[in-house]
């Protein structure tokens, strides 16, 4: 019984530690969503939740919206074969 609890705890921890993170990206331009208020940011939190679900979090990091706790298939910046503004 103890072994089962330890295994379940490890699986939960792995899911938490290895959750995907990254900048949300505009699929049309290939650019990150910009923000100017660094740290906790309502705009970034709202955009992350809108695009990636209720479980995600977000804040402004290096003038881009950084999302946390994303599902593995979430698309984040940089997009393959697409540079920001076509550059």
From Swiss-Prot:
One of its GO terms (molecular function) is sodium channel inhibitor activity. GO terms for biological process: defense response. Expressed by the venom gland. One of its GO terms (cellular component) is extracellular region. Disulfide bonds join 31-84, 35-60, 44-65, 48-67. Residues 20-85 form the LCN-type CS-alpha/beta domain. The modification Asparagine amide is found at residue 85. Keywords: Amidation, Disulfide bond, Ion channel impairing toxin, Neurotoxin, Secreted, Signal, Toxin, Voltage-gated sodium channel impairing toxin. Residues 1-19 form the signal peptide. The keyword Protein transport does not apply. Coiled coil: none annotated. InterPro entries: LCN-type_CS_alpha_beta_dom (IPR044062), Scorpion_toxin-like (IPR003614), Scorpion_toxin-like_sf (IPR036574), Scorpion_toxinL (IPR018218). Its main location: secreted. Gene3D superfamilies: Knottin, scorpion toxin-like. Belongs to the long (4 C-C) scorpion toxin superfamily. Sodium channel inhibitor family. Beta subfamily. Beta toxins bind voltage-independently at site-4 of sodium channels (Nav) and shift the voltage of activation toward more negative potentials thereby affecting sodium channel activation and promoting spontaneous and repetitive firing. Has the structural arrangement of an alpha-helix connected to antiparallel beta-sheets by disulfide bonds (CS-alpha/beta). This is Beta-toxin CsE3. The lineage of its organism: Eukaryota, Metazoa, Ecdysozoa, Arthropoda, Chelicerata.
């Amino acid at each position: 019984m103890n072994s089962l609890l330890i295994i379940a705890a490890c699986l939960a921890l792995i899911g938490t530690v290895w959750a995907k993170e990254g900048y949300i990206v505009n699929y049309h331009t290939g650019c990150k969503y910009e923000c100017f208020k660094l740290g906790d940011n309502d705009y970034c939190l709202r955009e992350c939740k809108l695009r990636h679900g209720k479980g995600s979090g977000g804040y402004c990091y290096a003038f881009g919206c950084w999302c946390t706790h994303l599902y593995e298939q979430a698309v984040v910046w940089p997009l393959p074969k697409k540079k920001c503004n076509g550059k």
